[in-house]
Amino acid sequence: MSSQQQQRQQQQCPPQRAQQQQVKQPCQPPPVKCQETCAPKTKDPCAPQVKKQCPPKGTIIPAQQKCPSAQQASKSKQK
């Protein structure tokens, strides 16, 4: 039994150390990458999103349809 207990202890030791190292290594990279990707990602998508929304602007289609009626109403009121 003593041989089995020693083997179990040895097996448990390496995994625990490996887990600690693995946890520390990945833990540090994610935050660093997060900040790096966060800044560029927010800037890159921000510009493209604004530009992309401008050309398609699904709101413009309905707005244009309402625009004529709104302009006519404002003109009729002005007159």
UniProtKB/Swiss-Prot annotation:
Under the cellular component aspect of Gene Ontology, which terms does the record hold? cell cortex
Q: Where is this region: Disordered?
A: 1-79
What is the recorded post-translational modification?
A: Cross-linked to membrane proteins by transglutaminase.
Which Gene Ontology BP annotations are present? Answer: keratinization
Q: Which organism is it from?
A: Homo sapiens (Human)
> Main localization of the protein?
cytoplasm
The record's induction entry says:
By UV irradiation.
**Cellular localisation:** Cytoplasm; Cytoplasm, Cell cortex
Compositional bias annotation for Low complexity: 1-26
Q: Which residues form a coiled coil?
A: none
- Family note: Belongs to the cornifin (SPRR) family.
What name is this protein filed under?
Small proline-rich protein 4
> What UniProt keywords apply to this chain's record, in alphabetical order?
Cytoplasm, Keratinization
The gene for this chain is: SPRR4
- Protein's job: Cross-linked envelope protein of keratinocytes. Involved in UV-induced cornification.
